[in-house]
Amino acid sequence: MKKRRILFLGETYRADAITWMNGLKEFGDFEIITWELKTSNSGIFNRIKRIFEFGHAFFKIKKIIQLQKPDMVIAERTTSYGFLAALSGVKPVAIAQQGRTDLWPEKSISLPLKKLIQNYAFKKSDLIHAWGPVMTISMIEANVNMNKVLVLPKGIDLEKFGNNNNANPEKICAIVTRSLLPEYRHDIILKSFAILNQKGIDFALTIIGDGSQLSKLKDLAKELSIENKVNFTGRIPNTALPKLLQQSNIYISMPITEGVSASLFEAMATNCYPIVSDIPGNQSWIEHRKNGQLIPIDDYKKLAEELIWSFENTEHRQQAVSKNRKFVEKNVDYSINMKIIADKYHQLIDGSKAE
């Protein structure tokens, strides 16, 4: 039997896109073809160039469809690739909202246009992915037909992200795995560890990833006199991540906005105790001082206090990480969740062919 073919519209280098595509191949036996914008989104010149590229994207996608004849189109982001998927003419279409809302930044002058584009994508799609409950709030506000919405995270590979944690119990071994971008507030994290350093509390802080803030953050670490205790790894292969998480006892993430964080799930799976910003995307999974800690946005002093509290309360941390592992096994297992998603796609294709 010929494999069914899916056209994926989105940035194929992103970890969650790779998870999505690989899961469909593994659990749905789909063949995946891809298309994405080639121009970078950094810098004003590139953004203007990217807008022109987006304007011609429809014709390029139509040509791919004529040649490859996909059975279905899927796309990330309801305000860009999701809109192109809705315009493609292929049925069925599944789109995924990537954040708490894709209408971001919230004060952007292009917001009215983005709303129009998003509403069109929502109406024309056959399935809308909400990778977590927090995403449904903006969908309800946009009057989306919630019968089309599947609330389910893609999940993580629980074999790869095992719970055999071997962090040094004698000191804070903290890890940050978010991109080095302003919205992730790595500077707040560094300032909190400077307070710990001033108090004579031993720690090792590992900051994974790359991004526009790297040189600024390295300079800040020097300015705070903690550069010898902070390890900036740069970008690493995803295969190296589980081991680094397993060598850490505390996971920190301080974003100002969040949809559903696979990074948080990875930390929960590997018995890293999560300390995260107190925002809706994190409140869906973390209860303060129950299975982690929630910190007000940009409050580095509070973060320092809670880091000390969590490290001193060893029994609490042990109970929390055990609870978190059970939670991800029940709710965020990639092999279970991606099978559900792949089966749903087959059903949609069957229904479309029957019409």
Where are these regions (language model features)?
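Conserved donor-binding/catalytic core segment of Leloir-type glycosyltransferases
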Residues: L7, H129, A167-F193, T206
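Membrane-proximal helix-turn-helix segments that form the acceptor-binding/catalytic region
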Residues: F59-K63, L111-I128, I137
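Short alpha-helical donor nucleotide-sugar binding micro-motif in glycosyltransferases
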Residues: I65, R235-I236, K243-S248
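Carbohydrate-associated surface elements
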Residues: V134, G155
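A conserved nucleotide-sugar
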Residues: E183-H186, L190-F232, T239
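Aromatic "clamp/platform" in nucleotide-sugar-dependent glycosyltransferases that forms part
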Residues: I256
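Short hydrophobic beta-strand element within catalytic cores of glycosyltransferases
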Residues: Y273-V276
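Conserved acidic donor-binding segment of nucleotide-sugar-dependent glycosyltransferases
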Residues: H288-R289, Q293-Y300, W309-E315
